[in-house]
């Protein structure tokens, strides 16, 4: 019984130590298919390698939040860092600008990454 309590305590201490680790998210913004003006596509924002899991992600059109956005379930990698995919349908053109804005404890202010149609 004492051995079980000691092991349980060790596990709890190890898990609480994970919360102290902070890793900034890597942000990648891309379209599902090569961009063609007037042709429907999907805009993706892949956010990975972050810890802790609390994060806010917004897709933007001309600096304004896009309301109809879907996302994957929060998942974690072998190193216990987290990743998410946010996406929405959009139709690219020459006048609109798209971006992904991320708020995380590792950033003093939200970070915005613009979509580059040539990537």
Curated annotation (Swiss-Prot):
GO cellular component: extracellular region; MHC class I protein complex
Domain Ig-like C1-type span(s) in chain numbering: 25-114
Localisation: Secreted
Leader peptide range in chain numbering: 1-20
Disulfide bonds: 45-100
Biological process per Gene Ontology, one example term: antigen processing and presentation of peptide antigen via MHC class I
Keyword Secreted: yes
Domain of life, source organism: Eukaryota
Keywords (A to Z) from UniProt: Disulfide bond, Immunity, Immunoglobulin domain, MHC I, Secreted, Signal
Keyword set includes Secreted: yes
Gene3D superfamilies according to UniProt: Immunoglobulins (2.60.40.10)
Pfam families cross-referenced by the UniProt entry: C1-set
Function (record text): Component of the class I major histocompatibility complex (MHC). Involved in the presentation of peptide antigens to the immune system.
Assembly mode: Heterodimer of an alpha chain and a beta chain. Beta-2-microglobulin is the beta-chain of major histocompatibility complex class I molecules.
Family, per entry: Belongs to the beta-2-microglobulin family.
Protein name: Beta-2-microglobulin
Designated gene of the protein: B2M
